[in-house]
Every structure is written in C-alpha cells, then in structure tokens.
C-alpha cells in the first residue's frame, strides 16, 4: 500500500485540477453542464483514481487504477482541444496546459510500469 499524499503524480494531478477549475471558471455560462462539468470531472478523476488505487493490496490492482487515471487525462486533453477550437482559450494557454497533461501522463505511465 502506498501513501498517495507522498506520490508526485498525485500532487501534480491535484495542481492540474486546481488549474482546470480556474480555467473553466472563465468559460461561458451556457457550458456549465457541458464542457465545464466534463473537464472538471475528468480532471478530478485523475488524482481520485491514484488515491483509490494506492489503497489496493496488489500492485496489479493499483496499476489498473493508474490506467484509469491515464484515460481520464486523455479525456481531459481531448476536451482541452475542443475548448481551443471553440476559442474559449488561446493557443498559449492550450499549449501550457497540454504540456502539463502530457508530462503527467508520462509520469503516471512510468510509475505504473515500475509497479508491474
């Protein structure tokens, strides 16, 4: 069992959640039940699954939850692309957050591979 609070992948994903909430607060109000909700849920799913997986007694089970976290990060990345296409964000913000997501995906993948 791992202490999720000490995992860099968890702390970085918590930072990403904060950033996504701040970003989506700038979106049009008509997106409240659309992209805003979807992006926030995808972002929250990343650290939540890391934390839940850390309680599992086997590394195989933990790795499965890390795969779910990676899937949520890919969902978030897709939604970020949509927000760029809709011009809710500019390309600089997009690139900055996308790079953050990609770094996190790589970190989670490396950690998962070490468990297996």
Predicted segments with their positions:
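Amphipathic alpha-helical assembly/interaction segments
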Residues: 1-116
């Amino acid at each position: 069992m791992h202490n999720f609070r000490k995992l860099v992948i968890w702390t970085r994903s918590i930072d990403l959640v904060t950033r996504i909430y701040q970003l989506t607060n700038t979106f049009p109000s008509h997106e409240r039940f659309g992209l805003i909700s979807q992006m926030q849920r995808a972002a929250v799913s990343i650290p939540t699954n890391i934390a839940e997986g850390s309680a599992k007694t086997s590394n195989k089970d933990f790795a499965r939850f890390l795969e779910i976290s990676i899937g949520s990060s890919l969902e978030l990345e897709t939604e970020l692309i949509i927000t760029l296409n809709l011009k809710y964000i500019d390309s600089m913000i997009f690139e900055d957050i996308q790079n953050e997501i990609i770094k996190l995906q790589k970190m989670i993948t490396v950690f998962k591979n070490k468990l297996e």
